[in-house]
């Protein structure tokens, strides 16, 4: 490849073509150097295709709703959902309306993908879709859609209507003010929790080209990171936010629906979904009916229910992402967010100027007084029609709180810090902007508030330790219960003397897990219930000791059972921490596990953890849970799982430090765009 690229360079550079360098470090992470942002995007497209071409092409098919024509009938319903929301149509219609700079970046990115496909036709699957730059717009819409769709689904559920399930999304994010850190600069933790497989499997990348200088995680098939940092600031997001979407109860009769005093015709369209059957592609027609509120998604008791999403005709997400990627200060970041293109999220921004900032972001409709958007609203009366979109200034937000820290692990703004000034009463006129209560924090958030509130002179190493902490919330309450019920039990003393960390090498942590599961429903509780008897505790201890010594042996530890490794691989490694719902155990480090043989192997949770010290320039550390490449022979298929993630470590990014990067370069490619 290098020889081909150099030949191209010698032939073409005289005509003003741009040279792009792709330097890969010892973990296969691409560091792309170009003269322009478009050149960097070209390199990004090439590198992503080199590592995960098939997954990228699947992402485009998912967004368009054309999976079934390539992979069969099991994807028909998924395709229907994407057709329902018109991702392809909106993207095709409005691509021309994007900022020319964004169009140039999209086109350069796909040119890079096409270049790789041209040079490596043996890697191009027969089902590969034709590449078009508008697919990046469709993919952006597809990626954010689960959040507003989930809000509307919640409205339907509260009316007793079971909507189609929407995937769970969770995350951690933290910010420390300069006065709490050893470097006297803010520290950010960017820690999304999603599936380790599929469209949310992030791609790690560093990009340098023109005004684009960024490190972070991007969705495969998009040109630059959405989570990470540039030279001036960091950006993190977690699930949670204002109520952005609604359901309406509609009166429908004979292909018409009532609105005020008239019966309007339903908007009816037919989507033709290709379905692979053997060697053929057959077509299934699906009928989609909509009112002016949105598509009809459910029926019950003679009523139809439409879903109204304010992002339905939006297409400028990439523009907002670009504005964040190139922002130079907090004011620039706020202007980018004010475009209201991002889904409902808790967004945190830290800057090299020393700012820490939070906004409960989203595109939020203005609802009339007296209407309850938490349930389906009447569609026929006209009394609950949207009255525009709330401006960015209306959203819940705070800059530089006196506490000197913030965290949001999918919690209410009230639970982000001790004595939080962000209380729901301040938004009582429009409670859907706050969209939460003074509810107590979940275990992850409660632990992090305690840790951050006590933090002083925090180093990068200490912040990495916090991000990967395996401390089990309220384990001390169970230890006290064990002491009370079985003060003479030697095995009970092992658990009672445990340091309450689910470290991979801890036998007591594994024993605690088995003890909690032996308690049945009581063990799934975070705190010991009053109804738990001493006899039940002693019985669970006896069962646990027998299981631990009999089924697992004297050397078994937490990491004997809880492992990390890639699906389809032949090896796994012990890992610390995780969210063990069946035992009521949670740690700041989030990992969810599935049984694989006799092991519990991670499948979701921390997907691209970043620790960013906002010095000038920033210093950062990052890890993904598996590996950068989908090519098993590359050496980067599961190397981060083995060498970093299983050891609760993150590697330096060498951001804006090419001299140091050069010491770690393992491959070097030159391309021409």
Residue ranges and their predicted role:
Residues 17-480, 500-673:
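C-terminal/peripheral segments of proteins
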Residues 480-489, 493-496:
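Large, well-folded core regions of big proteins
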């Amino acid at each position: 490849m290098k020889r081909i690229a150099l030949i191209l360079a010698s032939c073409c550079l005289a005509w003003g073509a741009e040279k792009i360098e792709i330097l890969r470090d010892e973990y296969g992470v691409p560091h792309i150097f170009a003269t322009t942002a478009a050149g960097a995007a070209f390199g990004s497209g090439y590198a992503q295709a080199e590592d995960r071409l098939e997954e990228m092409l699947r992402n485009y098919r998912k967004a368009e709703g054309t999976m079934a024509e390539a992979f069969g009938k099991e994807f028909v319903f998924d395709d229907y959902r994407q057709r329902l929301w018109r991702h392809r149509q909106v993207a095709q219609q409005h691509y021309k309306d994007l900022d020319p700079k964004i169009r140039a970046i999209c086109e350069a990115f796909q040119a890079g993908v096409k270049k790789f496909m041209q040079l490596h036709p043996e890697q191009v699957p027969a089902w590969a879709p034709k590449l078009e730059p508008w697919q990046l717009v469709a993919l952006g819409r597809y990626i954010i859609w689960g959040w507003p769709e989930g809000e509307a689904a919640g409205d339907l559920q509260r009316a007793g209507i079971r909507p189609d399930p929407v995937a769970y999304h969770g995350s951690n994010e933290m910010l420390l003010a300069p006065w709490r850190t050893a470097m006297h600069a803010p520290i950010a933790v960017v820690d999304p929790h999603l599936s380790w497989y599929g469209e949310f499997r992030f791609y790690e990348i560093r990009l340098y080209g023109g005004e684009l200088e960024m490190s972070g995680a991007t969705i495969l098939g998009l040109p630059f990171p959405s989570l990470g940092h540039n030279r001036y600031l960091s950006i993190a997001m977690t699930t949670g936010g204002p109520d952005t979407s609604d359901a309406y109860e509609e009166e429908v009769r004979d292909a018409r629906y009532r609105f005020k005093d008239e019966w309007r015709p339903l908007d009816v369209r037919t989507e033709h979904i290709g379905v692979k059957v053997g060697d053929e592609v057959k077509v299934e027609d699906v009928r989609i009916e909509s009112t002016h509120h949105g598509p009809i998604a459910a029926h019950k008791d003679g009523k139809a229910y439409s879903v109204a999403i304010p992002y339905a005709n939006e297409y400028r997400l990439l523009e907002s992402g670009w504005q964040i990627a190139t922002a130079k200060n907090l004011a620039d970041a706020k202007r980018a967010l004010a475009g209201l293109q991002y889904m409902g999220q808790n967004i945190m921004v830290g800057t090299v100027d020393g700012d820490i900032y939070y906004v409960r972001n989203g595109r939020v409709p203005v609802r009339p007084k007296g209407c309850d958007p938490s349930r389906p609203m009447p569609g026929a009366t006209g009394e609950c029609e949207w009255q525009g979109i709330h401006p960015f200034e209306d959203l819940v937000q705070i800059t530089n709180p006196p506490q000197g820290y913030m965290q949001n692990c999918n919690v209410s703004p009230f639970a982000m810090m001790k004595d939080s000034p962000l209380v729901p009463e301040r938004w009582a006129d429009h409670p859907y902007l706050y969209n939460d209560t003074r509810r107590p924090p979940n275990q992850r958030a409660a632990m992090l508030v305690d840790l951050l509130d006590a933090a002083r002179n925090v180093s990068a190493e200490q912040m990495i330790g916090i991000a990967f902490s395996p401390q089990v919330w309220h384990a001390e309450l169970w230890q006290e219960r064990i002491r009370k019920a079985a003060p003479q039990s030697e095995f009970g003393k092992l658990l009672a003397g445990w340091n309450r960390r689910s470290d991979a090498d801890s036998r007591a942590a594994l024993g605690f897990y088995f003890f909690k599961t032996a308690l049945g429903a009581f063990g799934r509780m975070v705190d010991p219930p009053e109804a738990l008897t001493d006899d039940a505790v002693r019985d669970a201890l006896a069962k646990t000791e027998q299981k631990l010594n009999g089924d697992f042996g004297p050397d078994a530890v937490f990491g004997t059972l809880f492992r990390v490794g890639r699906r389809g691989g032949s090896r796994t490694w012990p890992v610390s921490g995780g969210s063990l719902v069946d035992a009521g155990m949670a740690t700041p480090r989030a990992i969810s596990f599935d049984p694989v043989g006799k092991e519990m192997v991670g499948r979701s949770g921390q997907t691209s953890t970043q620790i960013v010290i906002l010095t000038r320039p920033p210093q950062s550390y990052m890890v993904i849970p598996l590996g950068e490449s989908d090519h098993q022979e590359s050496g980067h298929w599961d190397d981060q799982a083995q060498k970093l993630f299983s050891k609760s470590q993150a590697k330096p990014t060498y951001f804006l430090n090419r001299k140091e990067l050069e010491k770690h370069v393992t491959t070097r490619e030159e391309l021409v765009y």
